[in-house]
């Protein structure tokens, strides 16, 4: 739970004592891993009512004790620090000053943004560190303890996209997704062990719909990340741009991503939903599809690739800049150029590379379409993308 790209790693057919099962549940939280219930045995036909009642009592007692520990590590300051220290020991700490400064800056900005949406963040300010893992991931564990993999910084040179990843994890933290998931897991594991047959554990799993909550939680965290971003100067198109980048960069090694696809929404779905958030933020004026940005249903620009960023990824950043302009009423002023940058009021829209259309041409086009009425049924109802990490001045 909470990990950007984490999936079940608990081995099948391994028998644990109740204490070890609970410990496994809690330990997995350090890595924000969803748990498997494959260790619960097949129901016994001889299990009667008395067995089930006894299992209920045993499960309640065991889960109550485990929940007391869970509450300690999740909510008390002492427990949060113990958990944070364990996370650092478990994952390793990268002392790189540049990466840590970037994380510090983003966390400072996002913490203020989260507070504007949910003041409860002040009750448990986030602890965070950069770990040594070179893969792409970030996770929020118990007690608002967070970590970002070193590899995430390498894959995402844009601070806007990095901020979206971190905002996503803070969304998990604010909604207590990790603790809630562990709580369910403890109850199921305790109940299953108490029967010795897995009958109650199987029923509990069905009733609580345990791991099936992962996709809704991921969607909720993405939506919260977008909301947090709109309370900062980061580009609101960063979420859509991020998922476009992930799809493109991981084509050559899909196996590294297939580990989590059953637990998380697909990358293209997450991109499209985030682009819809951007369109809504613009008041329905700005959309993007297939690398083309539309304003009021009319083609504005198809950004070219630049550096290691594709035209499609850039288009989501352009969409984000335009959405910010419309949201903040900069569209009431004329578009113009500052060198190779197209401006709309005080809002930068796109920094044109040599492969893009001329900035003056784009400014003239934007002036011609920004006040027109949206064309129903046009491609603007699809999705949005944005340019190379330009920030939204709000």
Each model region followed by its residue ranges:
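Peri-catalytic and regulatory segments of divalent metal-dependent proteins
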Residues: 48-186, 232, 252-255
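Short glycine/threonine-rich beta-strand-turn micro-motifs
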Residues: 334-353
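Short, Lys/Arg-enriched N-terminal segments with co-localized hydrophobic residues
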Residues: 1-5
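Extracytoplasmic/secreted envelope proteins and their assembly/folding machinery
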Residues: 80-84, 96, 100, 104-111, ...
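Bacterial N-terminal signal peptides that target proteins for export
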Residues: 9-29
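C-terminal capping/extension segments of zinc metalloprotease domains
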Residues: 24, 28, 40, 44-81, ...
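C-terminal non-catalytic accessory extensions
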Residues: 347-350, 355-379
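Post-HEXXH active-site segment of zinc metalloproteases
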Residues: 54, 177-207
């Amino acid at each position: 739970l909470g990990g950007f790209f984490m999936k079940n790693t608990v081995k099948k057919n391994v028998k644990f004592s109740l204490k070890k099962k609970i410990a496994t549940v809690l330990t997995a939280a350090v890595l924000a891993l969803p748990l498997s219930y494959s260790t619960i045995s097949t129901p016994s036909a001889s299990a009667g009512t008395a067995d089930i009642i006894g299992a209920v009592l045993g499960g309640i007692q065991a889960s109550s004790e485990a929940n007391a520990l869970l509450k300690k590590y999740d909510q008390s300051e002492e427990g949060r620090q113990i958990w944070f220290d364990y996370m650092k020991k478990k994952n390793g700490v990268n002392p790189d000053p540049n990466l840590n400064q970037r994380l510090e800056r983003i966390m400072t900005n996002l913490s203020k943004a989260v507070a504007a949406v949910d003041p409860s963040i002040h009750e448990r300010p986030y602890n965070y560190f950069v770990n040594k893992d070179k893969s792409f991931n970030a996770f929020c564990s118990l007690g608002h303890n967070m970590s970002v993999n070193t590899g995430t910084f390498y894959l995402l040179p844009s601070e806007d996209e990095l901020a979206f990843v971190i905002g996503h994890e803070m969304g998990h933290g604010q909604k207590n997704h990790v603790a809630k998931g562990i709580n369910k897991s403890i109850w199921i594991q305790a109940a299953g062990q108490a029967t010795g047959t897995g009958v109650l554990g199987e029923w509990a799993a069905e009733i609580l719909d345990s791991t099936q909550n992962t996709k809704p939680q991921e969607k909720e965290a993405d939506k919260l990340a977008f909301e947090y971003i709109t309370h900062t100067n980061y580009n609101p198109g960063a979420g859509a741009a991020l998922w476009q980048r992930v799809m493109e960069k991981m084509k050559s090694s899909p196996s590294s991503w297939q580990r989590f696809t059953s637990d998380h929404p697909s990358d293209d779905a997450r991109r499209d939903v985030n682009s819809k958030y951007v369109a809504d933020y613009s008041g329905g004026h700005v959309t993007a599809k297939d690398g083309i940005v539309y304003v009021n249903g009319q083609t504005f620009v198809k950004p070219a690739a630049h550096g290691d960023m594709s035209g499609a990824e850039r288009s989501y950043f352009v969409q984000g800049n335009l959405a910010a302009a419309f949201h903040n009423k900069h569209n009431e002023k004329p578009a113009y150029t500052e060198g190779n940058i197209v401006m709309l009021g005080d809002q930068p829209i796109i920094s044109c590379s040599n492969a893009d259309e001329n900035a003056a041409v784009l400014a003239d086009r934007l002036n011609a379409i920004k006040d027109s009425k949206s064309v129903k049924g046009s491609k603007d109802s699809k999705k949005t993308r944005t340019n190379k990490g330009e920030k939204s001045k709000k």
